[in-house]
Amino acid sequence: MRKTKIVCTLGPSTDQPGILRQLLENGMNVARFNFSHGDYAEHKGRLDQLRTLSKELDVSIPAMLDTKGPEIRLGEFENGKEQLTAGQKFILTSRNVKGTKEISSITYKDLPHDVSVGGRIMLDDGLISLRIESITDTDIVCTVENDGVIKTKKGVNVPGVHLSMPYMSQRDRDDILFGIEQGYDLISASFTRSAQDIMDIRHLLDEHNANIRIIAKIENQEGIDNIDEILSVADGIMVARGDMGVEIDYAEIPSIQKHLIDHAMQMGKICITATQMLDSMIVNPRPTRAEITDVANAIYDGTGAVMLSGETAAGKYPVEALKAMAMIAETTESDTNYESLCHHVGMDSTRLTISAAVSHAACTTASDISASAIITASKSGETARLLSRFRPDAPIIACVLDETTCRQMNVYRGVTPLLMDYAHSTDELISMSVKAAEDAGLIHSGDRVVVTAGVPVGVSGTTNMIKVHLVGDTLLTGIGINPGLNAKGEVCVCRNAEEAAKKFKAGQMLVVPFTTNDTLPYMRQAAGIIAEEAGANSHSAIVGLTLGKPVIIGATHATRTLKDGMKISMDCARGVVQAMSE
């Protein structure tokens, strides 16, 4: 089960018949809606289609609204685009003019008051560099430093300059209100500079009683400098490397990426690494070797999610890009040292709570017993977030009560959310959550799982209990020999050595009334041994210890209860034999 989540941006390419369905079927975890492009009708149409297909395919996919943010763009060009030549003069103006080879209007009218002579302005994600020569109240006269084609509405970046423009524009406010009305689950806040930027959005959400999680997009030096205060109020961050690579020295991006991912991981917050991850797949069916390594390194660093932008929104190969991303993630995860990751995150005494301590203990317990999963029943999803922080190898199954929380949990690394009904007691909570996970095919009879919950039931933030639970119906009990060993397999009931000689096959679970030296060859080949005879000095016990085999002795009526061909599991530590689902 892949732990790293994949965010796919919807756009014209995903509007093609059948494409969105294929993305959902091939592992898309989050759908991103880029509000820098398109209108409300387009976004609503895509959201409606997402909700319809998600329900049909029974998947919980959150919708993420990516705001336009306090960005600066060029105005309209008479011919749509112009060729600029190194050495020529080019004017950026706050006046409303049609763009030509010599001049373009800009969307931020106070930019002439924020910049200085000698500074640099970058156009179109840094493809064209301008050096500021002189400034008037309305015009910024620049020298073009390199050849390039400039187009209508392309972005403008001013590296190292604090802009006095307000964070949330009326456009962003309207977009967020639209998102509240339509039921979006996440907001990615573009160009976040400070904690106050996030609080401005949160106040707007609170005014409308909206349960939407906020992810701060870190794209400039201010955001990097203020990362701790931003993380303290945001639900997570996006390492948005596109504008970041224009706003700061691009050679610093790898170290900044590691720094941001680590901060988010230490604080248990969502972390999405984004921009140009498989950029070549916009036009090519396979990624470059450098892109493969880029995705893998972000996962090695601990990112919780990776994002596809133009690859799925406007590319020729949206489904292939998703499949490639998923394959890279799965391969990288198989080579990840989870104990080292958990140790790296550790327990921070400044953020130590009972819930955090229990979550950490659940992760270490799951590692110690090689649990098939960690199951948490949570009203708010907070426990799932805490578990995800410690990056366990075992998948985290979060059983929640409402659809919005269920969708929101799908952005957290390693978390698979499930809907369940309200439980009235702790025992009911455990049984219902285990059954929900079993019904979903995430765990199976015979699996050992770690369950966390809160007592009393139904109170948020009270996770204070851990239980190791064996999934399935108990068929037999006895005394386990070699308690550190377990086995699963197909039953072969043999009442004596002659019967074993006729039908026993290597790797089966040997079920006998007792053993003798004549059955020794079959004991050697068995996956596990279940004997009715009891006693620590019995033949079965002594041979089991000598061979280092999982053995349960004293299993009364085993040869009558178990039938040939049954699939069972045995847990020597507990002396339990359970039925496995087919």
Where is each model-derived feature located?
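Conserved alpha/beta-domain cores
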Residues: 3, 8-13, 42, 161, ...
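Structural preference for beta-strand elements that scaffold enzyme active sites
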Residues: 5-7, 30-32, 60-64, 89, ...
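Conserved, mostly hydrophobic/aromatic
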Residues: 9, 34, 66, 118, ...
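Glycine-rich phosphate-binding active-site loops on the catalytic face of alpha/beta enzymes
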Residues: 10-12, 29-40, 186-191, 237-248, ...
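Feature captures the catalytic cores and cofactor-binding loops of soluble hydro-lyases/lyases
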Residues: 38-42, 46, 394-395, 399-429, ...
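C-terminal helical cap(s) of enzyme catalytic domains, especially alpha/beta-barrels
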Residues: 44-51, 312-335, 467-469
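Acidic, glycine-rich flexible loop/linker segments
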Residues: 70-169, 436, 442-498, 525-526, ...
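Protease-associated
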Residues: 352-360, 364-366, 468-522
